[in-house]
Amino acid sequence: MIKKSEKLVITFYTTTSAMAMEKICKECGADGRIIPVPGSISADCGLAWCAKNESEDALLALMVQHNITPQGIYHCLV
């Protein structure tokens, strides 16, 4: 079993926003990947962006630049 570690988890209101985040992050080489929303978090969309905690500032700036609105930003075991 893979050991869980604390990660940054960003949830979204819509699947479209989650997919836009994935596309932009891949284009920019930003850290992270799409995951199912962890059971400890409630969100409108079932997809979330998971990345290292250290990536938070860069990812938030990227979302502002591309008009992506997060539903929630969490630090949890994934």
Task: Put a short name on every predicted segment.
Residues 13-31:
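Short amphipathic alpha-helix segments
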Residues 50-78:
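C-terminal structural segments of small proteins and small subunits
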Residues 1-2, 34-41:
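Short, flexible, solvent-exposed loop/turn segments with mixed acidic/basic and small polar residues
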Residues 31-37, 71-72:
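A short linear hydrophobic-aromatic micro-motif
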Residues 10-13, 51:
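Small/polar loops that bind or transfer phosphate-bearing groups
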Residues 42-47:
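Surface-exposed aromatic
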